[in-house]
Amino acid sequence: MMSENITAVEPQENNDVEADSDPFNIDKLIVDYDYLLYKIQDELESIQLKTLEICQKQNEIVEHGIIEEVIDGNIGMAKDLLQKCDDLEKHYDQLDAVEGIVVSFKSRLKGVITQYKKYIDTKK
């Protein structure tokens, strides 16, 4: 029975020994401090990853926005060039029409000149 009492007392003595060796709970404070540093580091890494993701997304948005603006600008310039080409084509069509008028005018003028010469020859 005595050994039972001693056994029951030993853990208490261990607690007393631990309490005596660390009366201010420095070991627990160190563990808590290390855990706090770990949590801070973990939170910083989490914030860093989120910040990096946000920056990458913003960068993509800016790049796509800039690229879209450049593409839209190029499309606008291409449309302007196509409009100018259409205008030139209309001018060429007008020139072709004028050429047709000139060719028909020349043939009619030759006919008029021929008739006039015949008329003059008949008057002589």
UniProtKB/Swiss-Prot annotation:
- Major place of localization? cytoplasm
Coiled-coil ranges from the UniProt annotation: 75-98
Q: Which range is the signal sequence, renumbered to this chain?
A: none
Q: Keywords for this entry?
A: Coiled coil, Cytoplasm, Transport
Q: Which InterPro entries does UniProt cross-reference here?
A: CNL1
* One GO location term (cellular component): cytoplasm
Q: Spell out the residue ranges making up region: Disordered.
A: 1-20
Q: Name one GO biological process term.
A: endosome organization
Cell compartment(s), UniProt? Cytoplasm
The UniProt entry's sequence similarity note says: Belongs to the BLOC1S4 family.
Q: What does this protein do?
A: Component of the biogenesis of lysosome-related organelles complex-1 (BLOC-1), a complex that is involved in endosomal cargo sorting.
Q: How does it assemble?
A: Component of the biogenesis of lysosome-related organelles complex-1 (BLOC-1).
Q: What is the name listed in the Swiss-Prot or TrEMBL entry for this protein?
A: Biogenesis of lysosome-related organelles complex 1 subunit CNL1
Gene that encodes it: CLN1
